[in-house]
Amino acid sequence: MKKRRSDMIKKGFDRAPHRSLLRAAGVKDEDFDKPFIAVVNSYIDIIPGHVHLQEFGRIVKEAIREAGGVPFEMNTIGVDDGIAMGHIGMRYSLPSREIIADSIETVISAHWFDGMVCIPNCDKITPGMMMAAMRLNIPTIFVSGGPMKAGVTKDGRKISLSSVFEGVGAYLGGTLDEKGLEELERYGCPTCGSCSGMFTANSMNCLAEALGLALPGNGTILAVDPARKELVRQSAKQLMYLIEHDIKPRDIVTEKAIDNAFALDMALGGSTNTVLHTLAIANEAGIDYSLERINEVASRVPHLAKLAPASDVHYIEDLHEAGGVSAVLNELSKKEGALHLDTLTVTGKTLGENIAGCEVKNYDVIRPIDNPYSETGGLTILFGNLAPDGAVIKTGAVQGGITRHEGPAIVFDSQEEALEGIASGKIKPGHVVVIRYEGPKGGPGMPEMLAPTSQIVGMGLGTKVALVTDGRFSGASRGLSVGHVSPEAAEGGPIAFIQDGDIIEIDTVKRTINVKLSDEELERRKANWKGFEPKVKTGYLARYSKHVTSASTGGIMRI
């Protein structure tokens, strides 16, 4: 009989008390020789991306039993970034990733499971589960809840949640009336699933395919498509193959696999949050992956698809109908050096074998390799005296083909102050809006800036104003928006010393971000800096603020 991890809690005379408890949980005599499987779900009623996952958990458990395993379901917490947006709730979003990873580690380690089926979907749940998978390194497969259908207005326009956020800006700017805003609200989110554009959740669930942690189709099959349930069933059965062949996450997620994930990210113009999360996943896998390496990937990978928010026409459902992630990767494989095709995946085959023959079905959605939107990827890491340790911009979602912006800073010490400034008309064409003390430590929690970016775009300033922050952006953000500025203001980074009127230059071609001040002037201002006073002094956020690291290292916790 093959020895299993779970034998720790079920084999031997001294485990009689353990078996007694397991029998009370429904385990039968014949089950004690079978692998124990953790069904790591994230069902929660208030998140539309997760409201349907209870049924997916049932499907997984049924499939595990059919394949000869014994399933046990657990749930993680979750935060809906859209609902948490614009108030203190957003400060809990990124920190929830660490709780998710820690809670999974706790349950799996305490109960000695043989493998995991992870069922995430929305923004921090997927990376939190991936971090746990790397940390635990037991056979694991991912199958997400799937994307939401795009909304459709009465006049036939496709819309998404980002359309609703931008509608608030248009309403503030007087270009949309209350009735128009209500229509966006009612039609923006028509089904369950992760929001319908290439936002953070869908970006990460697509990257799961490129990393090799999920079966093909994971990132794009709609939540309401019957094919999603079949994918859930097949994923559960595939885990049993991984257990039988002892294929573990760290066998799959290598440095080359992370290159592949970022290559897909560049081709799709994914969310800037993927940088933060993938660096954290790499850290858990014991891989030292630098921001500079991301630029190296971007330099050899073209941008092939523009989906919402970079496009008002194409959504995740369109990507799926055009061939999905496999078609994008297959198209990329036609360019030498764009992908490592020999990386292992949960299919037991290589990435190259998985994508062979997956041709693009619609070149309006996925451009051919010889006619990309740009020769370099849709994400760029910037460096300069304003961000010595790096900053991130989603170049694929910058409107009007703008590659350079120079203008005077208008500085806000919080997102709330910035929103007041935007609403009161303080932001003028040419400005560089600086929002600081919103990094991992300073926020605390590095809140997303979807409300400011959406209002700027909605007011018609999307091509006339830049935004720079040590916070981060929603995957639904677009425009000339630079986030993750490191070191952050709370750590005494240069962004803390910017004053109104300082001239900031952003150049995405040169990959630079600089403030036109001498080193001596920056040092003088630093000497007069009063330091950072934590905003939250009790509870989890206070502990998080004390121990979290920079965005440039993935916002992970110091041990």
From Swiss-Prot:
User: Where, by residue number, does [2Fe-2S] cluster bind?
Assistant: C122, C195
User: Which NCBIfam families does this one have?
Assistant: ilvD (TIGR00110), PRK00911.1 (NF002068)
Q: Which residues form the active site?
A: S474 (proton acceptor)
Q: Which family does it belong to?
A: Belongs to the IlvD/Edd family.
Quaternary context: Homodimer.
What does the cofactor field's note say?
A: Binds 1 [2Fe-2S] cluster per subunit. This cluster acts as a Lewis acid cofactor.
| E.C. code | 4.2.1.9
Instruction: Give cofactor(s), names only.
Output: [2Fe-2S] cluster; Mg(2+)
What is the stated purpose of this protein? Functions in the biosynthesis of branched-chain amino acids. Catalyzes the dehydration of (2R,3R)-2,3-dihydroxy-3-methylpentanoate (2,3-dihydroxy-3-methylvalerate) into 2-oxo-3-methylpentanoate (2-oxo-3-methylvalerate) and of (2R)-2,3-dihydroxy-3-methylbutanoate (2,3-dihydroxyisovalerate) into 2-oxo-3-methylbutanoate (2-oxoisovalerate), the penultimate precursor to L-isoleucine and L-valine, respectively.
Q: Which GO terms describe its cellular component?
A: cytosol
Enumerate the InterPro entries for this protein: Dihydro-acid_dehy_C, DihydroxyA_deHydtase, DiOHA_6PGluconate_deHydtase_CS, ILV_EDD_C, ILV_EDD_N, IlvD/EDD_N
Q: What is this protein called?
A: Dihydroxy-acid dehydratase
